[in-house]
Every structure is written in structure tokens, then in C-alpha cells.
Amino acid sequence: MKKFLLTTLAALVSAALSAQVYTEASDLTLIGKIIDTPNPYHRVDTVKYKGFTKAENLQVRCPAGIAVLFRTDSPSITVKATGDFSYQANNTMRLASHGFDLYIRKDGEWLWAAACCPAPRNPQAPMDLIKNMAPGVKECLLYLPIYSELTSVKIGVEEGRMLQPMESPFRHRVAIFGSSYTHGISTSRAGMSYPDQFTRHTGIQLLSLGCSGNCKMQPYFAAVLEDVDADAFVFDAFSNPNAKMIEQRLFPFIERLQATHPGKPLIFQQTIRRERRNFDTAVEATEAAKQHMADSLMKIAVKRYKDVYYIKPSTSTPLQESSVDGTHPDDYGYYQWSRSIEKPLLRILRKYGLR
């Protein structure tokens, strides 16, 4: 009897899933893409752009910061995806690295709705994202995984229900190149990086090229940024390189981008304070040196170069307890970062007619 019930239940579940009608996400509206790529879920075309390390090559093929906009009246939404879901890290939840993160617009605000993650043993199986929604058309924003290379993402709605591309409500194209912080490492969900939170709260579209451990103002990343169609550029450029590297690379990096993007604002962020500095004297010395170097050189840069700016984010709480691992903030820390740069960044963008 028990076996019969389980078999019947499995058949019912299968029938329910088969009743879903699927649409490839790239046939809807993608936002957050920094540059066009043959695979719509890649951030950089690694056939065209060369020089990346093996780790960087994977990172730029992961869709961190890319999201899908669509409208549907379906009471339920499912997701099917194919790709490489092998990344593992102790400091980042699978819902962020492998998962899909849904927001729905309500009363003009993007409100969190649901998240799902591929099953480790059967990652290509359909995932129930959300069910039992009230009648009516929903405007949806679905973030893609931050650390999984995707070959296909299909969004499923109930048969007979509407699924349409949604015109993007996000304004402008502001590129952001950064470290694991910009990538979203240690977030709990795929849409919780500080660029994603900034975009939802301000309506200004940030195009993320966050690469964990690998934002060091490398010439081959500059080559990508030279080809990016953006209204402004933001950098989290002082988190990964040491003081000597900052000294050697900062001014050539600025000059190269100004040559290809004259008149566009280049906005550099100081790196945040890592809680590992609290008692580790070696980390304290290294971090203090690179922050001092960044402060010293940016003081010169903002005077030497037109359209170059310097802002300082913060993730601090009174007892510095927003850290996951001594390096990366948690979701609340990234929220603090997003809010701390909001006023200075918007003030700079307004100077260039970006409102």
C-alpha cells in the first residue's frame, strides 16, 4: 500500500511538472550584462578576450549580477537549468552560488518572493520556485547564480498562463568591476550583493564584473572594460591587490580607460575594513598598507585626472559583527555597503545627467 501511494504521488508530481510551459530566460529580458556574449549567461566572451587565469576564466563565465525580468499571471513558477554547479565554498550558501533568487514588484518596491537551488545529485531537474500566488499579473526579477556557469535557464509557468518579457525599469548602464565583495561572496542568496541591492533600491542599473580574488587592475580586464558601453564606471579596485601593485597599476589603469571613455566618470571605492585585522598583526599590516596606498594615490588622482572620483564604503556595525569569515560581510554588511555609497555615488552620477 505504501509503495502504491508513493508511486501515485510521484506520478502526480510528474504530471504537475509536465503541465508547465517553459521559456528560455534569454528570450525574456536580461539586465545586468556588462557586454554582449555568444552565451547570454556569460559576462565576458573568453574566446574573444584572452589572458585570464583558469579561475578568472570561470568567474567571467558565471552570471553573477545578471537577472531576468518578466511578467506572468501564473500562480506558480518553476525553473530548469543546465550548467556547471560544482563550485563549493564554506563561506557562501548554495542558494547564492548555485541558486535562483526571485523578487516581485509590489507597490513600486522590489519585494523578496522566493529562492530555489538545484539538487546536488540531479541539478537538471525542475525546481519549484514559488507556488500558490494570488491571481493577477506579477512583475518578476529573477537573479541567476553567482558562481555557476549556465548553458540554459528555462522559466516555467502553468499551461495557459502568460509569460512575457518585461521592459526594464532600471535606468542607465553603470559598469562595476570589483573583487569578491562585488561578486557577492558570502551572501545567502544570488541577489544580495551590494551592486544588486543598490540597483533595486535606486533604479540605477549596475553591470557587475565582480571576480572573487581577481580584481587587480589587470591589463586584460582593462581590455574588456575598454569595449564596454557604459555611462559611468565604478571600481572596487583596492581589495585584492597589495600596496605595491596598487602603486604600479593605478595610474596606467586610469589613463587607459580615460583614453577610450573620455568624459565618463571613473569612481573608485576604498576597500572595507576586514575583521581579521582585529587580532592578526600580519593582516593588519598588509591591509593598512594597501588602504594607505590607495588613499595617498587617489588624493593625487582626483586632482590630476578629470572625471575621477574616490568614495569610501562602510559595512560597519558597532561591534564589527557583520563579517562571515573575517573578510566578507554577510547580507546585512552588504546592505550597509550599498546604502553607504548611495548618496555619494548618486551625487556624482547627477553631474553627468544620470538620474
Region spans (language model):
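N-terminal secretory targeting modules
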Residues: 8, 13, 18-173, 349-355
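A short helix->loop->beta-strand "cap" motif at the edges of active sites that frequently abuts
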Residues: 261-265
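Positively charged n-region of N-terminal signal peptides that target proteins for export
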Residues: 1-4
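Histidine-centered active-site loop/cap adjacent to the catalytic His
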Residues: 324-355
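Oxyanion-hole/transition-state-stabilizing segment in secreted/luminal serine hydrolases
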Residues: 215-251, 256, 271-278
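Serine-esterase "nucleophile elbow" of acetyl-processing enzymes
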Residues: 71, 132-134, 139-215, 219-229
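Substrate-gating cap/lid alpha-helix
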Residues: 274-312, 355
